[in-house]
Amino acid sequence: IAFEIAAKTLSAEVISITEKSSSLTKGENLRDTVLNIQALGADAIVIRHSSPGSALFLSRTIEVPIINAGDGAHEHPSQALLDIYTLREKLGELHGKKITILGDILFSRVARSNLWGLIKLGADVTFAGPSTLVPREFEELGATVTHNINDALKEADAVMLLRIQHERQSSSHFPSLSEYTKIFGLKFQRSEM
């Protein structure tokens, strides 16, 4: 909806297509669907798809610009741009700022996209949450990883909270939501750190 509102604000004509209203339900593949949309004269295509890498694949397949509005648990660069804009609006220059991203990092497309953008702007990024949702492998991408929320909040210039991505998980990655909230929830006392 946000892209549609933004486009209409800029006087663009918008056609919203859902998977249910497209030929995908009749067996047409995503590539052919997008090629048909291009043939109908689209100037750009905004896509949100459950398959990781779908936007990149399509950008290499067709000639019109593809805007990635989220692809599975892979990326969500448009949300990251909005988050980074908001952080810069509130904090100014992000170089050297300490940004903590707390929550379900493993299944979050927003966390990855924010990490790449924030690092490019010189921010220090910390991922925090339970070890089952914040694996150490994210250190290889440039993040500091901690499973101690108090350490993550110390000296943070900004904290981003991510919800648990239940829809992308096939099993529970923590004993219960109440236990997760008790250990990793941002409480008023912690927000003053």
Predicted regions and their residues:
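Short amphipathic alpha-helical segments and helix-helix/interface helices
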Residues: E4, V34, A55-L56, L115-W116, ...
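Short, flexible loop segments at the rims of nucleotide/cofactor-binding pockets, characterized by
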Residues: S21-T25, A44, G103-I105, F138-E139, ...
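Solvent-exposed alpha-helices and their adjacent loops that cap or buttress functional pockets
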Residues: N36-A39, L58-T61, P65, L91-H95, ...
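Short glycine-rich anion-binding loops that position phosphate/pyrophosphate groups of nucleotides
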Residues: S50-S51, I105, R163-R168
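Rossmann-like adenosine-cofactor binding region
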Residues: F138-M193
